[in-house]
Amino acid sequence: MAVAELSPSYKTQLKTCQQLSSSLSTRLSDHRKFSLRLLPRPVSVRGGIRCSVAPNQVQAPVAVPAEGQTGKPECYGIFCLTYDLKAEEETKTWKKMITIAVSGAAGMISNHLLFKLASGEVFGPDQPIALKLLGSERSFNALEGVAMELEDSLYPLLRAVSIGIDPYDIFQDAEWALLIGAKPRGPGMERADLLDINGQIFAEQGKALNAVASRNVKVIVVGNPCNTNALICLKNAPNIPAKNFHGLTRLDENRAKCQLALKAGVFYDKVSNMTIWGNHSTTQVPDFLNAKIDGLPVKTVIKDHKWLEEEFTVMIQKRGGALIQKWGRSSAASTAVSIADAIKSLVTPTPEGDWFSSAVYTNGNPYGIAEDLVFSMPCRSKGDGDYELVKDVVFDDYLRQRIKKSEEELLAEKRCTAHLTGEGVAVCDLPAGDTMLPGEM
């Protein structure tokens, strides 16, 4: 972002910092020490300003970067303060702070998700976090607005917030990367075009993660088409275990549980062992064969098998489109909830006998699904961020046929993006028909 674009707001930023320092000087108690300093205003091709405070409140001169020097992500407001707490006053029960990077951080989904993360709802009431928010030049003002709201919310577990537009800065040392940002499919855009446009975004983000993120970073890809975007991302991050990459199919799982509960006349917490197989598209396979209601097989509880085979899957696929008709926009809050659910499924032990759905790397899978894909399958976790595939599932011809169709689609998407995964020239022979979910067009 050019300096000229940020200059009008700099004095306002400085004034805010001066006011903050004045307020702090009168309110800080003796037992907490703050190291406060006014940082020079860096100028670079990546742009940005830094905000902090110092007792003398002298504006620093504009710093001109050396050739090749790059900017850093911006700490924001109160999060620019350096805390120096006495050892005996530190919270003894808190865990070591974890760093979470979020792309598309100025969007509606993130606007719901970030506050769940900051509140402790996702990682727990004893887990402090640092949020690193990735936006674009166009969304940078909105990104500052998000940071302001986080600042005003006074979350004790939120210890640091930084904002920026360069993934190589924002992904530095990230232990979780929630990749939400992607271009939506516009009018007249072919599916192959969307695969290419968003694939380039996730190829670049994969390279950035590979270069600067934690070697054990956990990555959840939300931007669509999420399965193939996750595959592209992991192929561009060879230093990170492929097993650490997930495509989000949890919203599909949650929707399937809701519809089964409605049909059975029970509350949705009675539905377990729900699997979404395959692609996050209209070829997805909500598995009612292995799912249970109150511990019993779904087909035992719901006698209307025609409904299960002919209507149930279509209802899940069309749920997003139905929401748009009512709400006027695609789902944001429920998507944020599903991201939170997906993370919680990895950081808390899976209840005995249950499992959850996630689109993960297929190498070594026990189901006979083609390898080298990102395919939604049933998983269990011990709560350590890792997972294992569930082996004790059953298949019938109906389920296998539909899984095969989704597999063929993902193989075609892989061929269509071969130029982004280092596997040669792309050949787009996508199956006939439009399989994008109605809520994502």
Curated annotation (Swiss-Prot):
The residues that the entry says bind NAD(+) are: 205
Recorded hits in Pfam families, A to Z, give: Ldh_1_C, Ldh_1_N
Gene induction: Expression decreases transiently in the leaves after salt stress and then increases to levels greater than two-fold higher than in unstressed plants.
The highest taxon in the source lineage is Eukaryota
The record's GO CC annotations read: chloroplast
Which GO biological process entries does UniProt record here? malate metabolic process
Q: What name appears for this protein in its UniProt entry? A: Malate dehydrogenase [NADP], chloroplastic
Instruction: Supply the source organism for this entry.
Output: Mesembryanthemum crystallinum
Gene symbol of the encoding locus: MDH1
